[in-house]
Amino acid sequence: MAQVFNFSSGPAMLPAEVLKLAQQELRDWHGLGTSVMEISHRGKEFIQVAEEAEQDFRDLLNIPSNYKVLFCHGGGRGQFAGVPLNLLGDKTTADYVDAGYWAASAIKEAKKYCAPQIIDAKITVDGKRAVKPMREWQLSDNAAYLHYCPNETIDGIAIDETPDFGPEVVVTADFSSTILSAPLDVSRYGVIYAGAQKNIGPAGLTLVIVREDLLGKAHESCPSILDYTVLNDNDSMFNTPPTFAWYLSGLVFKWLKAQGGVAAMHKINQQKAELLYGVIDNSDFYRNDVAQANRSRMNVPFQLADNTLDKVFLEESFAAGLHALKGHRVVGGMRASIYNAMPIEGVKALTDFMIDFERRHG
């Protein structure tokens, strides 16, 4: 079969080694004669899978002992509700930074539960889209927490700064598309959440990292499956969890450790992004409209100077084994999502194609 590189924004490419191992174990997991999908989530076999996955995840991010790790349903959008329902307490407002599509979606959901104070961080620098530095974010005095999205998959915008607002500010963040791609100081956050389908594993699983002093504050109307305390007290098994997604995510964690961990992956991700942005920046045929300081290393949107060639580009790239390059309907153009599982060979194949396409159509 010809080599295919999947640039989908999510569900996204999984490491080939992980897929191969899952395929080998699919019908007979560890000699049980059954699939891991078929065993009880409360049996000792799956409990071992769950415990190993959590420990490997903790190791990869150096998660402090006073933080709990929850394996949840609901995706990032579920946490758009889960965060206010768990953290508002007796307060009626929270600070929300608007820097892109997903941040705005979180704000829209939060309005059901509180009156968010919106910090519009979107700016333009030399004609390109950018984000205000954190020192310019005007936080309110009465906010229960601060929420932001470090990586906007649709806009291709990243906020790489580490928050430093003092211990009185509970920082929450949607790391769905950038978790495990670069070192992360978990201690600077109150809550970190991430849908699994981009940098962790298959869709259906959501990870939440929550500082333990923030437990026990859920609103009485909070659904039990979103209540961090309920989930923690039941080892993330208040109801049947997405066991296969949990198992596969655990395999990805072991794969990441074998690659050298998050620091090693960060170096590779930088190389991939530099390679792709380099081709875009050295061409009049392609363009990216995000300021360099806020460019995402995970999601690279780009446009053709002649958008009548978009359809041809997508058809020819697909035929060349470069799949899922169509940009989001909100922004159009192209988008290459180059998460951890995308090898540098895939990015090299894309850039070679882009150079050749420009030669033939420019």
Swiss-Prot record:
Could you say which EC number(s) this protein's record lists?
2.6.1.52
Transport as UniProt keyword: no
Cofactor: how and how many bound = Binds 1 pyridoxal phosphate per subunit.
The pathway this protein participates in, as annotated, is:
Amino-acid biosynthesis; L-serine biosynthesis; L-serine from 3-phospho-D-glycerate: step 2/3; Cofactor biosynthesis; pyridoxine 5'-phosphate biosynthesis; pyridoxine 5'-phosphate from D-erythrose 4-phosphate: step 3/5
User: Which Gene Ontology cellular component annotation is one that this UniProt entry carries?
Assistant: cytoplasm
Binding locations of L-glutamate:
9, 42
What Gene3D superfamilies does the database record attribute to this sequence?
Answer: Aspartate Aminotransferase, domain 1, Type I PLP-dependent aspartate aminotransferase-like (Major domain)
- Give the UniProt record's GO annotations in the biological process aspect: L-serine biosynthetic process; pyridoxine biosynthetic process
InterPro entries linked: Aminotrans_V_dom, Aminotrans_V_PyrdxlP_BS, Pser_aminoTfrase, PyrdxlP-dep_Trfase, PyrdxlP-dep_Trfase_major, PyrdxlP-dep_Trfase_small
The catalysed reaction is: O-phospho-L-serine + 2-oxoglutarate = 3-phosphooxypyruvate + L-glutamate; 4-(phosphooxy)-L-threonine + 2-oxoglutarate = (R)-3-hydroxy-2-oxo-4-phosphooxybutanoate + L-glutamate
Name the record gives this protein: Phosphoserine aminotransferase
What is the organism of origin for this protein?
Salmonella paratyphi C (strain RKS4594)
**Organism phylogeny:** Bacteria, Pseudomonadati, Pseudomonadota, Gammaproteobacteria, Enterobacterales
What's the gene? Answer: serC
